[in-house]
Amino acid sequence: MSEISTALSLENCPCQSSHHYADCCGKFHLRQAFPETAEQLMRSRYTAYVLKNIPYIVVTTVPSQQTLLKPRLLQEWADNTTWLGLEILKTESLTKTQSAVEFKAIFQGEECEQAHQERSIFVKIEDRWYFVDPTVSLPTMKQPCVCGSGKKFKHCCGGFL
C-alpha cells in the first residue's frame, strides 16, 4: 500500500481524468467509495496497475473469477511494465447491468512505446461494477453466467465476450 500512500500526493491521477488522485481513483483504491460507472472502474483498474496495487485488481474482478487469478503473475507483470497513458475510446451500456469500455493503454516496451487496445466487459452485481476477465477459464455457454445472474452464460455475459 506504500505506492498508494505516495500516490495520494499526486496532483494528476494516472488515469488521466484530469482530477487529483485522492479525488479520483484514490478513493476507490482505499475503499472509501466504489466506482459508479464501468468507465470509472476501468480507469481505477488502470491506475491500480500503474501503482502495482494487485489486491485491487483481484477484488474488482467478477467474484466467481477471483480465485482463478494468479496474483503473483499479475504482480510480476505490473513490476515489469511502465504505463505511460490511458485513452478511453468508447463506453457502451449493453444492458442495465452490463457495459463495455474500449480503451488504449500506452506502455514502454523493450525498445519503444507500445499500445494495448481492448474492449472490456463489466457487470454490475449488487450495485458494484466488476471486470469480467476473458483470460481465465469461462463457463461453457450452457453453464450459469460468471456474474451470478442465474442466466445461462450464452444468454448473459457470454454474448459480449
Swiss-Prot record:
Cystine bridges: none
Name of the featured protein: UPF0225 protein HI_0277
Listed Pfam families: SEC-C, YchJ_M-like
Family the entry assigns: Belongs to the UPF0225 family.
Superkingdom of the organism of origin: Bacteria
SUPFAM superfamilies assigned to the protein according to its UniProt record, in alphabetical order: NTF2-like, Sec-C motif
Organism of provenance: Haemophilus influenzae (strain ATCC 51907 / DSM 11121 / KW20 / Rd)
